[in-house]
Each structure stands twice: as structure tokens, then as C-alpha cells.
Amino acid sequence: MVDSGPIVSLRDVRRDYALGAERVHALQGVSLDVERGDYVAIVGPSGCGKSTLLNLIGVIDQPTSGTVTIAGKRVDAMSDREATSFRLHNIGFVFQRFYLMPILSALENVTLPMAEAKLRREERDARAAELLAYVGLSSRERHRPSELSGGEQQRVAIARALANHPALLLADEPTGELDARTGTEIISLFQRLNSDGTTIVVVTHDEDLAKAARHNVHMRDGRIVAA
């Protein structure tokens, strides 16, 4: 049975860090729901807690208190092994930097998450080719990152993030290292992904990317101030 509730649900989440003798309150009582099929941009000034929130949604970090439920599963107290497996099969990540393996081709980079998930070589290659075609890089699948433009590298990174059919795509400043024209192309790709059913949560300072999302969540000083 498919869970019909929100794909992301946070309740009264706090995240504190020790900074020397001081405690930094990165998130202060955050509650948030993201519905399946939604496209949400988290916006706000630097240091307001956007990336900390995204790390909790992505099960990269755990809250100091509160609950985090992703795709119907409580994730706020998972072991490292459980969190790694959950991320591999449920969450795709896109970052400001592309983090592609320089010695591998575009196609080989896209196959990496599938290899970790133990898919057969033939399945991996077919899925990677399909994804590279989706992002407009069929003719570049044998090229290494050094032979690709920044926009092309980000498209490879997006294809890689989709490799294991994730329930949720998370992106942290995905247009941050791209020029305006290339950034616009990536924004259009995210809109197409969402139109095709992908649930997306992005953290961004890019006003155009935020405007393209269906909903904006505004943060300040570790709190959601508008949603």
C-alpha cells in the first residue's frame, strides 16, 4: 500500500551545535510538510538554517529533538547503516558543485548509485542511457567531466541523482556555479522533472529558481517565518 501522507513531515524540530563553549541553535522548533509531487524552494538569508534543514530531510544529519518522517518512515533516530541504505533507495541529491568522478564517463558516473544498489551491469547502463537522454545528453554519454560544460556536468549530476528512482529529489544551490543562461536551462529541467511527477525540495538564493517552484518556504534565524 502506498503511503498517501506527506512525503516530508517534520514536527517541532530543533538542531543545536556546540561551538566552543557556546550552543548554536541552527533550527528552532521547525515544523514542515511537503506533499507528494510538490516542488518547494527553501529561501532566506545565509545562516538562517536552510542547509541544516535540507540535511535533516536528506537523512544526512539528525535533529537534536523533534521528529522527521520521510516517505512514511521515521528517520530521526536511524543508525548510520540504516540512513545510508534509506538515502540510497529513497533520496536523490544535487549540489552546487557537481562531484563527478573525473576518470569516468558521463554514463559511468550515472551508474554509480545503481552499482551501490547492486543492479546488474546491463540494467545500470540502460537506465543511465535513458536518464542522460532525458536530460539532453545522449550524444555526450561517453565524455568525461573535463570534456563537458558546467551546465552539462550539472545535468549529469541530476541524472545520477535520479538513478535509483528516488521518492524525493533534494538540491542545494543547484544553479550556484552556473551562468545565467545555463542556470535558466537547469531551472527548466527541474520544472519538467516536477511536471513528470518528481517531488523536489531546493535550497536557493536564486530568485528565478525560487519563482519556478510551486511553493516557497521562507526562513530566518532557524525558524520558518512564512510558507
Predicted region positions:
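ABC family nucleotide-binding domain
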Residues: 5-219
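Conserved switch/coupling elements of ABC/ABC-like ATPase nucleotide-binding domains
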Residues: 221-227
